[in-house]
Amino acid sequence: ADIALQNGGGVRIDIPAGEFTIADAFTLLPFSNTLWTVELTGQQIIDSLEEGLANTLDNGGSSGAYPYASGLRFDVNASAAAGSRISNVEINPRLAGSWGPIDVGATYTVVLNNFQASGGDGYNTLGEVTGAGNFVDTFTEYAQGFIDYVENLTEAGLSLQKLPLEEYSTKSYISRAGCDHSTTADCEGY
């Protein structure tokens, strides 16, 4: 896949320090979700990010809908109108090259869990695409996918590490109150 998307609520704990066990993986990712791949245009990806953010911020939303990604990063302005809160979306497919602006007309392969892909947490665009049958179910439980990733790191003599800041999906975050979380340490709330 070019990028991965994840709704925040699908991840239940921080990765513990020290040895990472299979039990930790299933505590981290406790749901019976499988990984699906979906072909999406850049515009559909942006629309999906907006939908996840709207479901986080609006109408008593849930922080579990907040969009996280790998190979994709963006700025968030929660004080902007719904539909225009996500900006400066950049992509680095497979984290194999350099970051550049997403092409709204290009098609990208996205991997994500089946709950989110089916429109869960307000990801309506994803639900429309997959509802039309446009997805591939890998039949890999997402916890198992993470276990495989950790095993591959271990076999290569590496360990889980905190991501470098340039790989964080949220580049900057301005709250509904207009506080810029990326420059002000005492911001409160969404």
Each PLM stretch: what is its role?
Residues 1-190:
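Catalytic centers of hydrolytic enzymes
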